[in-house]
C-alpha cells in the first residue's frame, strides 16, 4: 500500500494515532501485513499529551491525522514526513533496539490514565482470536459491522479483525452512538451488528435505541465489563423479538480481546454469566475457596493461543519473546457452574477492608447498578459509591439495604449523588476520576 511504501524492509515500530476513520484502518492493516509492529494510541488525545509513551517506546514512525508532524515538532525529532490520503506518516529518529519477530500489536491496559504499560500481542494471537470470534459468531462475508468503539481498544479492534478475516466490509463512523449521524450511517449502509461496553448500552437507552427502525441490525455484542441483568434481559428480549441476537462476552486485552461468550440460546438461563470458553480456549478456576453462598470462588485462569506474549513498558521490552506460554492468570475472581459457564464475582485487586471484613467492590457496584449508573471505590474503612441517580432519601434507603444484605453497619457505605460516572475513552469506569470526584464532593 501507499502507506507501507516508505517503511524499510527491517521490522519497524509504527505508532498509530487511532481514530475511527479509513486512514487508521489502513495504517493498522498495512503495518501488520508488511510484518511491522503497531503501537495503537488514542488519537482523540493531543499527541503532545502522549510524549511519555513516545519517549518510552521510541517508534520509528507515527501514522496520524494531518498536522501530526507539526504537533510533534517540540516533543520529538521529526526526520521526514509523507502526506497521504486522510493523514500523514511521520519518520522519527526511532531506535536500533531489536524487536521480537512475532510481535505485531501493542495495546494499552490503562484507558486514559497515561501509563506506558502495554500488552505485547503476536500476529498468531491476533489471528487466533479473530478466528475463534468468527467461528462462534458464525460470521460470513455479508456481515457489515459499524465502528462503535475506539480502535486502540482491544474490543473495538477485535470487531475489525474478526470481520476482516471472513472478508466482510466494515462501516467506518467517527460519530458517537448519541449522534444522529451515526444512526444515519448505520441505516444507510445496512449495518448488521453493533458492539458496545456497558456504558454504550446506557447511552443507547438515552437515545431510545429500541424504538429506532434498523431492520438490518441483527446482532448486538456486549463486553468490556458486566452489564446489569435488567439491561441484559431487556436487550436479549428486544433482539429476539426482531429475529436477532445479543451476544454477551468476556475478555481482556491480555488475551487479545475475548475469552468467553454466552450462546444466545442459553442467555436467559445463564443471565449474569460471562459465558463459556471460546473455541480453542480453556477456562478454569484455581485456588478456589467457598464463598458465603457456598460457591467455589477462585482466580480465573485462561489458556489459549490468543494469550499475549507479555507486558512492555518501553522499547527495550519489545525484544522479549513469549513469557506466558499461552496461560493467563486474569486477576478476576469467579466460579464455574455445572455446565462450565463462568460467573465473575470481582477482581482480586478490587477488595476493600470494612470494619475488618473483606468486601468485594465489584459486587457492591453491581448491586448499585441495579438502580442506575454507579461506581464503587474504597475509602477509609468504608465503601464509597458514586451514584448518577436517586434523591438523598433514596440513597439513604439503598445504603441501609446494602448494609442489611452484607450484614454490616450502614456507616460502612457512603453513597454520593453525582451528575455522571466518569469513563475512559473505551467506555469503562475511570476509577481514578471517580475517586477525585468523590474527594471533591
Where do the protein language model's features map onto the residues?
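ATP-dependent adenylate-forming carboxylate-activation enzymes
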Residues: 2, 18-19, 39-54, 66-68, ...
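Conserved AMP-binding/adenylate-forming
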Residues: 2-44, 148-149, 358
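AMP-binding/adenylate-forming catalytic core of the ANL superfamily
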Residues: 16, 304, 309-310, 331-411, ...
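Conserved pre-ATP/AMP-binding loop-to-beta segment of ANL
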Residues: 83-108, 114-115, 138-144
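Conserved AMP-binding A3 loop
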Residues: 104-131
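Conserved AMP-binding/adenylation subdomain of ANL enzymes
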Residues: 127-144, 152-193, 278
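Gly/Ser/Thr-rich phosphate-binding loop
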Residues: 191-196, 205-269, 282
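Conserved ATP/PPi-binding loop(s) of AMP-dependent carboxylate-activating enzymes
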Residues: 276-280, 290-321, 359
Amino acid at each position: 500500500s501507499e502507506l507501507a511504501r516508505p517503511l524499510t524492509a527491517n521490522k519497524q515500530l509504527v505508532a498509530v494515532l487511532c481514530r475511527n476513520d479509513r486512514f487508521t484502518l489502513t495504517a493498522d492493516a498495512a503495518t501488520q501485513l508488511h510484518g511491522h509492529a503497531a503501537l495503537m494510541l488514542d488519537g482523540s488525545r493531543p499527541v503532545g499529551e502522549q510524549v511519555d509513551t513516545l519517549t518510552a517506546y521510541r517508534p520509528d514512525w507515527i501514522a496520524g491525522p494531518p498536522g501530526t508532524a507539526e504537533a510533534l515538532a517540540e516533543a520529538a525529532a521529526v526526520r521526514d514526513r509523507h502526506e497521504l490520503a486522510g493523514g500523514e506518516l511521520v519518520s522519527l529518529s526511532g531506535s536500533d533496539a531489536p524487536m521480537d519477530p512475532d510481535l505485531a500489536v501493542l495495546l494499552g491496559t490503562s484507558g486514559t490514565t497515561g501509563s506506558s504499560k502495554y500488552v505485547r500481542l503476536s500476529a498468531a494471537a491476533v489471528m487466533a482470536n479473530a478466528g475463534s470470534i468468527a467461528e462462534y459468531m458464525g460470521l460470513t462475508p455479508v456481515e457489515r459491522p459499524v465502528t462503535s468503539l475506539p480502535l486502540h481498544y482491544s474490543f473495538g479492534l477485535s470487531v475489525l479483525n474478526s470481520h476482516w478475516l471472513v472478508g466482510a466490509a466494515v462501516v467506518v463512523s467517527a460519530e458517537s452512538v448519541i449522534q444522529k449521524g451515526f444512526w444515519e450511517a448505520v441505516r444507510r449502509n445496512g449495518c448488521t451488528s453493533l458492539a458496545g461496553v456497558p456504558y454504550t448500552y446506557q447511552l443507547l437507552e438515552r437515545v431510545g435505541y429500541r424504538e429506532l427502525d434498523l431492520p438490518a441490525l441483527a446482532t448486538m455484542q456486549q463486553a468490556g465489563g458486566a452489564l446489569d441483568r435488567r439491561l441484559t434481559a431487556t436487550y436479549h428480549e428486544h433482539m429476539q423479538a426482531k429475529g436477532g441476537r445479543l451476544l454477551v462476552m468476556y475478555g481482556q486485552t491480555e488475551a487479545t480481546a475475548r475469552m468467553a461468550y454466552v450462546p444466545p440460546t442459553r442467555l436467559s438461563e445463564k443471565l449474569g454469566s460471562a459465558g463459556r470458553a471460546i473455541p480453542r480456549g480453556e477456562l478454569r478456576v484455581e485456588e478456589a475457596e467457598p464463598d458465603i453462598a457456598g460457591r467455589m470462588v477462585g482466580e480465573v485462569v485462561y489458556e489459549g493461543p490468543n494469550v499475549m506474549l507479555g507486558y512492555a513498558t518501553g522499547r527495550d521490552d519489545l525484544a522479549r519473546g513469549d513469557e506466558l506460554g499461552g496461560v493467563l492468570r486474569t486477576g478476576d475472581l469467579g466460579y464455574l457452574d455445572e455446565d462450565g459457564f463462568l460467573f465473575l464475582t470481582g477482581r482480586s485487586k478490587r477488595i476493600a477492608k470494612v470494619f475488618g471484613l473483606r468486601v468485594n467492590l465489584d459486587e457492591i457496584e453491581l448491586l448499585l447498578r441495579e438502580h442506575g449508573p454507579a461506581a464503587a471505590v474504597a475509602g477509609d474503612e468504608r465503601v464509597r459509591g458514586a451514584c448518577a441517580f436517586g434523591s438523598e432519601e433514596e440513597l439513604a434507603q439503598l445504603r441501609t439495604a446494602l448494609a442489611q444484605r452484607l450484614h454490616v453497619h450502614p456507616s460502612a457505605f457512603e453513597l454520593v449523588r453525582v451528575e455522571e460516572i466518569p469513563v475512559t475513552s473505551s467506555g469503562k469506569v475511570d476509577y481514578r476520576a471517580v475517586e477525585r470526584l468523590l474527594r471533591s464532593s
